[in-house]
A protein has these predicted regions:
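Single conserved hydrophobic/aromatic residue that forms the stacking wall/gate
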Residues: 1-7, 11
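Transmembrane alpha-helix signature in integral membrane proteins
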Residues: 16, 166-195
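Membrane-interfacial helix termini and adjacent extracytoplasmic/periplasmic loops
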Residues: 33-36, 148-166, 224-258, 327-328
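Flexible loop/hinge segments at secondary-structure junctions
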Residues: 39-152
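Cytoplasmic-entry segments and transmembrane alpha-helices of multi-pass inner-membrane transporters
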Residues: 189-228, 266
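Transmembrane alpha-helices
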Residues: 266, 275, 289-325
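Interhelical loop and adjacent transmembrane-helix boundary motif
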Residues: 324-357
Length: 357
């Protein structure tokens, strides 16, 4: 009966939590849909190629590779066997003098047309206002950003030109890595301490530990981050012989430490609310102390324990500054927990825009 009642409370809490999370996700997606209305190429600019070039469209990743000179031949893009020649507006002075361009670049449209027409392998990134109606080349299609480019993209570089990279996969992967290991560290240790304080420790020990643990929950996250930076990061670098200690493991440990006070406090309070009569009845039936804890106290307290775990882990997963300080802030897809990474909350904090002065 106790187990059924406890499980019923858990299912109710899980249902309410799931609905809340679903509503948050729907709201965030509604706000983020504006991203998919944006074009791949930076607003106000176009990509122009020679008229003889058969290439009509490039993805954001291909554009980045071209301008980073990782792709150097049009053959790799389905075009002719010709070298890719990148042209930006600032390069125009290498082709024409200031007199030929005009004092205010009024002759720049004609000059850009001549450059594109005279170079078979050129790809020009220029403002759209410099493209005339009788432009001798052709413009690459500028499609809207697709879902695949966002959720399956492997690069996050929103300030890249000419095509910003909005690959969300590194951030999702980094968040999952850090969250999973934080839960793995915090959950068993937190529940063990809660059981000790509730069922094993004497009054004097409990009265000392409880305020100390509650005090830890009030420490600012930046202090935890600084502690991780000067203690945990060098320790990980030394133990695992790594080039840098700012890794996902450091972030997981810091987040686990931050989650522990909430998990311990709420779980311990839930266990202490178990009626004394239930404990004594279990012992009277011949159960040992540990059997009573496992079979009676924990099942009765499972709803409170679940709340403590959700609150503690929720705070850890949503943490920004502490994670930003110890994980290396690298927007790459990690293959192990011993590599630098970046989480979604840390990215939000790191890339907030500045208000105009």
């Amino acid at each position: 009966l106790v187990r059924s009642r406890g499980l019923g409370d858990v299912y109710k809490r899980q249902f309410v939590t799931s609905i809340t999370i679903l509503l948050i996700v729907v709201f965030l997606f509604a706000e983020a849909l504006g991203l998919f209305n944006k074009k791949v190429i930076e607003e106000g600019y176009v990509l122009a190629v020679n008229k003889a070039n058969p290439v009509q469209e490039l993805s954001a990743a291909q554009i980045k590779d071209v301008f980073d000179e990782e792709i150097t031949n049009w053959k790799e893009l389905g075009g002719p066997d010709a070298e890719v020649k990148v042209f930006r507006l600032e390069d125009i002075t290498s082709y024409f003098s200031e007199e030929e361009l005009g004092a205010e670049y009024e002759k720049a449209p004609r000059c850009i047309g001549e450059i594109v027409a005279g170079n078979p392998g050129i790809i020009a990134f220029v403002p759209s206002k410099f493209i005339e109606k009788d432009f001798p080349g052709h413009l690459l299609k500028d499609e809207s950003i697709s879902f695949d480019e966002v959720f399956a993209g492997k690069e996050w570089f929103p300030t890249a030109t000419p095509a910003p990279q909005f690959g969300f996969l590194p951030l999702i992967t980094g968040t999952l890595w850090v969250s999973f290991f934080a839960i793995l560290f915090a959950l068993p240790f937190g529940l063990s301490v809660a059981v000790y304080m509730s069922e094993v420790a004497d009054h004097r020990t409990r009265s000392f530990l409880k305020p100390v643990i509650e005090l830890l929950s009030g420490i600012p996250s930046v202090v935890y981050g600084f502690f991780g930076l000067i203690v945990i990061v060098p320790l990980i670098q030394k133990v695992f012989n790594l080039p840098v200690g700012e890794t996902g493991l450091a972030g997981s440990i810091v987040l686990a430490i931050m989650a522990l006070p909430t998990i311990i406090t709420v779980s311990e309070d839930a266990m202490r609310n178990c009626p004394r009569a239930m404990r004594e009845a279990s012992l009277a039936l011949g159960a040992t102390r540990w059997q009573t804890i496992y079979k009676v106290v924990i099942p009765f307290s499972v709803s409170g324990i679940t709340s403590g775990v959700v609150l503690g882990i929720g705070r850890a997963i949503g943490e920004t500054m502490a994670v930003l300080m110890v994980t290396g802030n690298a927007a790459v897809i990690p293959t192990t927990i011993l590599e630098p990474l970046r989480t979604i909350p840390a990215t939000i904090a790191a890339e907030l825009g500045e208000a105009p002065a």
